Each structure stands twice: as C-alpha cells, then as structure tokens.
Design a protein with these regions (language model features):
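Cell-envelope and extracellular/periplasmic
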Residues: 15-16, 43-48, 82, 128
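Charged helix-capping and loop-helix junction motifs
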Residues: 54-64, 99-105
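Catalytic His-Asp segment of secreted/periplasmic serine-dependent ester chemistry enzymes
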Residues: 85-165
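Short, small-residue-biased leader/transition segments that mark boundaries at the very start
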Residues: 2-5
Length: 165
C-alpha cells in the first residue's frame, strides 16, 4: 500500500511481514515518541495463523490502542478490518483454514474502535465474496496476499482517510 501512495512523503510503513499483535506492541515506543498525526493499524492475520482466538487478538489490539492513546493522545488512529482469506488455493493453510476467525475479529474490532474513539475502516466487505465469506479470487492468487488490483482497491478505500485533515 505504501508504494501505491507515492505522493505522501511523510508516510512511513512500519509493517513487518509475518508480524503479530505483540510484535507491533513491542515496537510502538519509537513510533509514538514521534507523535505521528495518524496511525493506520492493520494487524491480526498472522495471529490467526498461530491459532490465537479472536478474543485474544482483540485484547492485544486493545493494548496497542491504549498505548498509542496514552503516549500520543493527539494521534488520530485508524483501525482497519482484517482482510478475508481464501482456502481454495491450498496455500498458507494456517491462515486460510481459519477464515471464519477473520469475521469474528472484525465483528469485535469495530465496537473496539468506537469505544476507543478510533476510526474504523471496513476493508473486509470490499474484498469478501458475499456467497462464500472468503476473499474474492480477483484480488489474490494464493488466498492470503493481495494482487496489484487488490492493493489499488485498498489504496482507494484508505486514501480519503489519509487525505483527511
């Protein structure tokens, strides 16, 4: 997504491939010390692959949110829903075989955002096939990672929030 928004010179991508909620939490100090204007958080799918429950993932996201609010109270926080996955490819089975957990996380994430005064960005409904509850194959070729078309859709969804003053 960072590469799809090249005109934003002050945007920093702090995502790490394979990261989990507590990995984000443990790396927050230098980020919040910089008092960023905005933080866009999308985390949880790798926790799913480790067998972590939706409730535990939400608890850990809540810890992240509280730390950001405490250490950088003026930072506007955007919680992005976890993207759907699709198990039809036979790849990334730790993630894709637990596709129902993603919906459970998102059902809990939106109320968390409201409770904590964060904005909630619903990515899930744009990427999911309504009939199956799984990621639309138009956006992936492995059931987990986005193709270019998926990144462009994500960019189009997030851009208004990036542009917001």
């Amino acid at each position: 997504l960072h590469d799809a928004l090249p005109i934003y010179k002050n945007v920093k991508n702090r995502g790490i491939s394979g990261d989990i909620c507590m990995g984000v939490y443990d790396r927050l100090d230098p980020i919040v010390k910089g008092k960023p204007a905005k933080i866009f958080l999308l985390i949880g799918i790798n926790d799913v692959s480790r067998g972590t429950s939706a409730d535990k993932i939400i608890s850990e996201i809540s810890m992240i949110v509280r730390k950001i609010k405490q250490e950088s109270p003026k930072t506007k926080l955007y919680l992005q829903s976890v993207l759907p996955v699709n198990d039809c490819y036979g790849m990334f089975n730790g993630h894709t075989s637990r596709w129902q957990v993603v919906k459970q996380i998102n059902d809990l994430l939106e109320p968390l955002a409201v409770k904590e005064g964060a904005a909630y960005i619903d990515l899930y409904s744009h990427f999911v096939e309504k009939e199956t509850g799984k990621m639309n194959p138009v956006y992936t070729n492995d059931g987990l990672h986005l193709l270019g078309k998926g990144y462009l859709l994500w960019r189009d969804i997030v851009k208004p929030y990036v542009d917001q003053k």
